[in-house]
A protein has these predicted regions:
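Conserved small/polar residues in nucleotide/adenosyl-binding loops
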Residues: 1-5, 292-293
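Internal, well-ordered alpha/beta segment that forms a basic, Gly-enriched binding/recognition surface
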Residues: 37, 43-51
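Histidine-acidic metal/acid-base catalytic patches
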Residues: 46, 53-54, 68, 80-95, ...
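Aromatic-lined carbohydrate-recognition surfaces of secreted/lumenal glycan-active proteins
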Residues: 94-103
Length: 293
């Protein structure tokens, strides 16, 4: 679902900022620093109201680089206290998305390091708080699709930052590396739609860094690749898959997914774009437009 999302930024010091976030923002040991970070988030909500937004994403880089540098429990307590004040400022129709990340910029510990801490904090804050899944923010080889299923089951899936990665938070174009993983994630989303899962209403966003390509072209390409994964997931025969699962037929269950994944849906996507008034070949169309500007 399309949502006008506001992202706060307390992981960088801004010009004319009174206090530095070098040692944390919402979890800083200094109350003055925490209050500054809280105020920034509340201001983001106010700007969001002007822009017609309905959600605030909170990602912090707070953490530590050396053992003993930070008291794990006290840091999380400060995070919850700060977030609760932000939560109280949310309009009735807004949601608060808590974004986790395994490491970077902190390399020994990160306060909100994984989906477990994120969802525990979301449960503590209240029903308007949910966990955001950025595909590059997990530990290597983590089963992201199962995390998605768990968050859906407990009505705590906020949405996604779609991207791709090889080593960490690489923010590469969607579908450029792990296309099967992306398909499996979308398969869980389609399954939730199929089951009419309670509280299922995720936000879909792209969060990427384009250093060697035209950013517009990369965003176009990424959008197409996410659509491709979604369409392939729609082709999965849910009844057959459930039957194989009930019979403990692991091979055929896997093959049922691969049958959909290996299907070329490019013609369907092109037809969809044409019927929607879009370009059959988006990249070629965009490049042709550049010739006349």
């Amino acid at each position: 679902m399309y949502k006008r999302q506001i992202n706060s930024n307390t992981f960088q010091d801004q010009p004319r900022q009174t206090h530095s976030y070098k040692f944390g923002s919402l979890t800083n040991v200094s109350k003055e620093v925490r209050n500054q970070a809280i105020k920034h988030n509340v201001e983001c909500i106010e700007w969001g109201k002007v822009l017609g937004s309905d959600s605030l994403t909170v990602w912090i880089g707070d953490g530590s680089n050396l053992p003993g540098q930070q008291h794990f429990t006290h840091a999380l307590e400060r995070y919850l206290d700060s977030c609760s004040q932000i939560y109280e400022s949310l309009p009735d129709n807004w949601q608060m998305f808590l974004e986790h990340k395994m490491f970077e910029p902190a390399f020994y510990s990160t306060v909100i390091q994984d989906w477990g801490t994120s969802v525990l904090c979301a449960m503590e804050l209240g029903p308007k708080a949910k966990s955001l899944v950025d595909l590059g923010h997990h530990a290597p080889n983590v089963n992201i699709e199962m995390i998605v299923a768990r968050l859906i089951q407990f009505q705590k899936l906020a949405g996604f930052h779609f991207n791709d990665s090889k080593y960490g938070d690489d923010d590469l174009d969607s579908g450029s590396i792990n296309t099967y993983q992306q398909f499996l994630i979308l398969n869980e989303l389609v399954d939730a739609e199929y089951r009419k899962a309670k509280g299922f209403n995720p936000a879909y966003m792209l969060d990427q860094s384009h250093n060697v390509t035209d950013p517009i072209e990369s965003l176009i390409n990424s959008s197409v690749e996410v659509q491709r994964s979604y369409l392939k997931a729609l082709l999965v025969n849910r009844e057959k898959l459930q039957g194989y699962q009930d019979e403990n037929d692991a091979l055929m269950a896997s093959n049922e997914l691969k049958l959909a994944y290996n299907t070329d849906v490019s013609p369907i996507l092109a037809m969809y774009r044409m019927r929607a008034g879009g370009a059959i070949d988006p990249i070629a169309t965009y490049r042709s437009c550049l010739l006349y500007t």
